[in-house]
């Protein structure tokens, strides 16, 4: 069987692209999203919208405390899938806001949770990474490209709301 460049190259490229998409969309954790991150502190911001008002709560956890260790362990256990289209959004950041979505809130849902992960020790300058949860969906901030990229996981709402409610009880107004 003789390979012809005109006929077989597009097929080989399509197969390689399909393999790459499957690899990129595999389950990953924060160790893949934020390689080498060893945070010194985690800043938690929770926002709960009820009607036309909202309540904000904040929590700062520092490394070496039991609360920090528990939250960092929970964050490290999270497994997400990334959309291969994230790479397109990284290359063309203006595409980030082209789609809009609305969220259906249920009674007791916490609207937003921001997990800011800060690392200062051992680095020439500080490093910040961010995971976000909005009602039922996760995303992470790609500071290098200035975009928020979606993450998918099984039971995303249940896991996010449970984590948000646990942190809500620890946080201050």
What do these predicted regions represent?
Residues 4-173:
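Function-determining sites in protein domains
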């Amino acid at each position: 069987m003789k390979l012809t460049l005109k006929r077989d190259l597009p097929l080989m490229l399509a197969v390689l692209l399909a393999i790459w998409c499957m690899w990129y969309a595999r389950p990953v954790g924060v160790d893949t999203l934020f390689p080498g991150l060893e945070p010194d502190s985690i800043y938690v911001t929770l926002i709960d919208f009820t009607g036309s008002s909202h309540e904000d709560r904040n929590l700062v956890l520092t490394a070496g405390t039991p609360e920090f260790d528990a939250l960092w362990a929970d964050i490290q256990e999270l497994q997400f899938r990334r959309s291969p289209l994230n790479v397109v959004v990284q290359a063309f950041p203006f595409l980030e806001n082209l789609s809009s979505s609305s969220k259906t809130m249920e009674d007791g849902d916490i609207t937003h949770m921001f997990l800011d992960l800060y690392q200062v020790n051992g680095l020439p300058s500080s490093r910040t990474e961010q995971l976000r949860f909005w009602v039922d969906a996760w995303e992470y901030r790609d500071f290098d490209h200035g975009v928020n990229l979606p993450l998918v996981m099984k039971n995303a709402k249940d896991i996010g709301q449970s984590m948000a409610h646990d942190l809500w009880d620890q946080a201050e107004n």
